[in-house]
Amino acid sequence: MPRKPRQLPAQNTLPYLLLTLTALCGEYPIRQISHLPGGSAYLESVVTALRRDGLLRTFSKDGLRGLRLTSSAKRLLLADAPEWFSAYLTGSSEPNKLKSEIPRRLRLHRMAEILTIMHNADIPAFPWEKAPFSAASQSAAIPAYYTSREVKEIGPQGAKIKSSRATGILLTDGGIFLTYNTAKAQMKWEYKAELRFKALLQTEGVMPDAEISGIVFGSTMEQLSILTQPDAHSYFLLDGSFPHFYYLTNDRYGEAILRLLCDTQQRRTLDAILADGLHEGIPNWRVENDAIDSEGNPVLFAYTCDFPRIQRFDTALELHGMTGTLICFDYQEEALREICGQCVMLQSIDFQQFERSVLYS
């Protein structure tokens, strides 16, 4: 039987982090625990201890399992940091008034997954770690991630994006990224709502000169082929509304790409390594490219998995009867082979070597 909790774990510990993520989202997916920092045995012991101490409980229904705060945990968190948690653990806020319907719970799980990967990538994502969204244009602190809930708090304008499937937006030195999470399922996109979200960012003056792109997270690389199929609901992914849309997996691979998208200088470093032995790219050529090989064929650096750009490269090669090389990470190669035609040759980078020599060097 769980104890009656008397105190919280210390801040800046993994147990407190898990309680924080659960408080902000309402329900934390069991399957996501393995993505938190730490070994599997330690993570299991943390969850067991929080349950035993009466701070977390398991909620399971319709095959979907998650962790929820107990009433005692809410009380202790509010006493510990009211300025952090009052907006989430009081009144009629969704994390405080949880529902059991599968669509609502899945949305909470998707939000939790994105908050976790942002935290793992050292991107400020908790409300108290950054300026309010209404003041984001005056803040120099980037990168920063804002949940869709934070964006909607700007006032009446926020109602225009009510139907959007975006989990939030990521502000970086390279631009703004509307962020989505399809998880294991095929997402039903809301075309008009997503374009309204983009228009809202353009009119609200958040980084007014920044390019607006998209990131969609999924569970595996195999889901990429589904996203690139011509479908009425996902048409905006490839119709040019967003010239750049990146597919990232919800794991350490996706975390690494996320770090690259937030760090222009590190991308330049990797590009310079990949360009060694190649000729300089040709701007505004008939085939989009980052470099030219010794035979005069275009080369595209595709390690960020910008799938509209990859599709444009593939289509242009076929249209002009040319061949070209697409450079990606080894874990992306099989999925990219599936969506590219015979004109594209794939060349892969060893991801583990990249981690050791570039990402964390």
Positions of PLM-derived features:
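Short, cationic-aromatic polyanion-contact patches
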Residues: 10-12, 29, 61-82
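Short amphipathic alpha-helical interaction segments
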Residues: 36-53
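Short, Lys/Arg-enriched N-terminal segment that forms or immediately precedes the first helix
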Residues: 1-7
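A short, conserved structural fragment
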Residues: 51-62
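Short acidic, hydrophobic short linear motifs in intrinsically disordered regions
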Residues: 25-36
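Short, amphipathic alpha-helical interaction segments positioned at domain boundaries
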Residues: 72-105
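Exposed, interaction-prone assembly regions rather than primary DNA-binding/catalytic cores
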Residues: 95-190
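Long, compositionally biased intrinsically disordered regions
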Residues: 179-187, 199-361
